[in-house]
């Protein structure tokens, strides 16, 4: 015997409301009692099922009830239905006690079915069909009944779930409420009956879901880790952290500056410096200069890094923030020049230095000129650290790879990484294709590399500003307005 469960789970933080709808063989009642009877437990089932056929309203069974009055109809009663596969089920509802019972005992249902056919044939001009499966009146009426009652039940259950969700939450804020409804069948012979939808229906539903997703994608940000949706309006205030799993998603350079630097203290440097096409890089898809212009319009930036001076908890700092949204944060001649000028300014003014790394490496469109930036920046850092004895902190975010990792990304006095950051010199795909070896999953994640001693701290975004402030004060950099 099959057993069907309908689980409706509503979560709101620590609150859990579960409506378990299970099967019982003792709660069968006649369908005519859907209007008259209050007692769902009636023993003389055969007799009562036959009396159903005696009602004149059977011919209008498709108008028996609608979605509006289904609550009264199914409040505490049982009725017989037949699905499109020919399986007979007795269904029992008790909304007040959250009970939804389905029974498909084959021996019992066969007896009910034969009784049903006999009485339906009697109604059809008083004749009895020898083969009820070919009774056109019976098939048409039962098909209409099945479709109508299934749609009414579905509509009612969905409306009840929505109403319960609203009452429990006290608001329509869906960010704290998650409704999960599932129907599963515990049966050894459910593979054929599990999905009766046609391929055309599935394609239409998938197309509809895709259209809805595309229509509202500007309202949500999907997590790369758990694939949960985060409301974009509050995403920035939560520091681009996933509400479901806490995963650190990518941040723009402007958002990072706003997060780290005190309001009203940011002074950008070299904003008018833009890339040209020094080696006249040829591309069949799009010229390099046009691609630069496209990213400038898309991001509102002139290059893949923002540099400037600001205050962090009242402490003057020089900071460079790379932006992965601009050509993958790749390091070209302008990126290298802006960072070098910032380091030279910090050396001259004796300022602590922060560089937030988010890059795919050197920019191939500029050839060897982009590789030269590694040596140029490293040389400026040597003077800053070794000769002037100043304090430099790189912050490695996801991803930090290639020439950035091989140069200033790993030259800090104290190296900080974000949780779950992807940090590598060569990417996983490049290593596997070059060496023909499999790179283990997680071997280039911040947590694994931290255990190998590659950097000093893993700091989440929430306490990052206070951690930097303490490090600067430990190295004798104090706020200007300290009382």
From Swiss-Prot:
It catalyses: N(6)-carboxybiotinyl-L-lysyl-[protein] + acetyl-CoA = N(6)-biotinyl-L-lysyl-[protein] + malonyl-CoA. The keyword Chloroplast applies. Binds 1 zinc ion per subunit. Transmembrane segments: none annotated. Signal peptide: none annotated. One of its GO terms (molecular function) is zinc ion binding. It is an enzyme of class 2 (transferase). Coiled coil: none annotated. InterPro entries: AcCoA_carboxyl_beta (IPR034733), Acetyl_CoA_COase_Trfase_b_su (IPR000438), ClpP/crotonase-like_dom_sf (IPR029045), COA_CT_N (IPR011762). A zinc finger (C4-type) spans 223-245. It is found in: Plastid, Chloroplast stroma. Its cofactor is Zn(2+). Pathway: Lipid metabolism; malonyl-CoA biosynthesis; malonyl-CoA from acetyl-CoA: step 1/1. One of its GO terms (cellular component) is acetyl-CoA carboxylase complex. Zn(2+) binds at residues 223, 226, 242, 245. One of its GO terms (biological process) is malonyl-CoA biosynthetic process. Keywords: ATP-binding, Chloroplast, Fatty acid biosynthesis, Fatty acid metabolism, Lipid biosynthesis, Lipid metabolism, Metal-binding, Nucleotide-binding, Plastid, Transferase, Zinc, Zinc-finger. Residues 219-483 form the CoA carboxyltransferase N-terminal domain. Its EC number is 2.1.3.15. Acetyl-CoA carboxylase is a heterohexamer composed of biotin carboxyl carrier protein, biotin carboxylase and 2 subunits each of ACCase subunit alpha and ACCase plastid-coded subunit beta (accD). Component of the acetyl coenzyme A carboxylase (ACC) complex. Biotin carboxylase (BC) catalyzes the carboxylation of biotin on its carrier protein (BCCP) and then the CO(2) group is transferred by the transcarboxylase to acetyl-CoA to form malonyl-CoA. Belongs to the AccD/PCCB family. This is Acetyl-coenzyme A carboxylase carboxyl transferase subunit beta, chloroplastic. The lineage of its organism: Eukaryota, Viridiplantae, Streptophyta, Embryophyta, Tracheophyta.
